[in-house]
């Protein structure tokens, strides 16, 4: 065991403050804002977050768009082939 000040075993003097001296904060500026104030805060936070975004360059955007379009076309082809195959199986089984 250590006898260091502020450790779990030996708390320092700041940790022993009486409960009556500690102030509990209720409300404050955040709790007193009306609906329009909260809405304005929401939009300010949106703008702040959008400023943090690292936007892709034009070449990256072209590459990403091409990859998505090719993937969608391949998936459309796969679903079409499966649909035609199932239709033929159902037609064969049920006449």
Swiss-Prot record:
InterPro entries: SecE_bac (IPR005807), SecE_sf (IPR038379), Translocase_SecE/Sec61-g (IPR001901). Residues 1-35 are annotated as: Disordered. The chain crosses the membrane at residues 67-87. The keyword Chloroplast does not apply. It is found in: Cell membrane. It comes from the Bacteria. It is a single-pass membrane protein. One of its GO terms (cellular component) is plasma membrane. One of its GO terms (molecular function) is protein transmembrane transporter activity. Keywords: Cell membrane, Membrane, Protein transport, Translocation, Transmembrane, Transmembrane helix, Transport. One of its GO terms (biological process) is protein secretion. The keyword Oxidoreductase does not apply. PANTHER family: PROTEIN TRANSLOCASE SUBUNIT SECE. NCBIfam families: secE_bact (TIGR00964). Belongs to the SecE/SEC61-gamma family. HAMAP family: SecE. Essential subunit of the Sec protein translocation channel SecYEG. Clamps together the 2 halves of SecY. May contact the channel plug during translocation. Component of the Sec protein translocase complex. Heterotrimer consisting of SecY, SecE and SecG subunits. The heterotrimers can form oligomers, although 1 heterotrimer is thought to be able to translocate proteins. Interacts with the ribosome. Interacts with SecDF, and other proteins may be involved. Interacts with SecA. This is Protein translocase subunit SecE. The gene is secE.
């Amino acid at each position: 065991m250590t006898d260091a000040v502020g450790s779990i075993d030996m708390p320092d003097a700041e940790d022993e403050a009486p409960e009556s001296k500690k102030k509990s904060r209720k409300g404050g500026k955040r709790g007193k804002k009306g609906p329009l104030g909260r809405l304005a805060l929401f939009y300010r936070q949106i703008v702040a977050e959008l400023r943090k975004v690292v936007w892709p360059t034009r070449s990256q955007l072209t590459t990403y768009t091409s990859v998505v379009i090719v993937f969608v076309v391949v998936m459309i082809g796969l679903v079409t082939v499966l649909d035609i195959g199932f239709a033929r199986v159902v037609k064969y089984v049920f006449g």
